[in-house]
Amino acid sequence: MNRRFLLKAALGSLAGSGLGLRWAQSARAWSYIGSDGPDHWGELSPDYAACATGRHQSPIDLGRVEPVPMDSLQFDYRPTPLTLVNTGHTVRIDYASGSRLILERQPFELLQFHFHDPSEHTRSGQHQPMEIHFVHRNAPTQALVVLSVLVRAGQENPTLQKMWPYLPSQINQPSTVMREWVNARDLLPDTATSVFRYSGSLTTPPCSETVTWLVLGEPVTASLAQISQFYRLIGENARPTQSRPT
């Protein structure tokens, strides 16, 4: 698998495209290791300058943020046909329109969710084996909300088990499995009562500081076999935590 595939989060050009937050080809490759890894993203392109100079970068250690109750947060997620894309940097599940998160009475449509191994956010410096990012956008303002769920090793996750047989090895070739439907709600913890909320950035180039982060206070589980299957396909794809004011 070509982990140096030419990809970029072209957020600005997609704002009015109706495609949601997608990955597009770029003039410069980036990766998670070596000379085009996270320590060098800001050097790869002027478009990536925020990766080096931004003051509100993500991810962070959650010990720097006070958890707040989830009173202002509601989920209206509906089942969607399973559509998977291997971007070369993660596996993305594209979501059909009609599902949303409501934050302080404002609706944010769920565009997609994707995975990181290990987790990008930490607690007391400790990673979990995986993290799931649910990317939402408010249509009138184009504001982004990313809901994050940490994944610890434990019992097999039945929702992941529906998806994992179809993890694609070909890059940028969307695959829809019409006989399998998934509901993002099934990947959220049943017991979460608090959330870590802060203003931050995309965790991949161009590292735009346009994101409200909501990291749920309780994790979900996945089996070691499920975690290993994702790792064998993608490898490590987590940006280190960032030093920044909160």
Q: Model-derived features: where do they sit?
A:
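Alpha-carbonic anhydrase
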Residues: 2-246
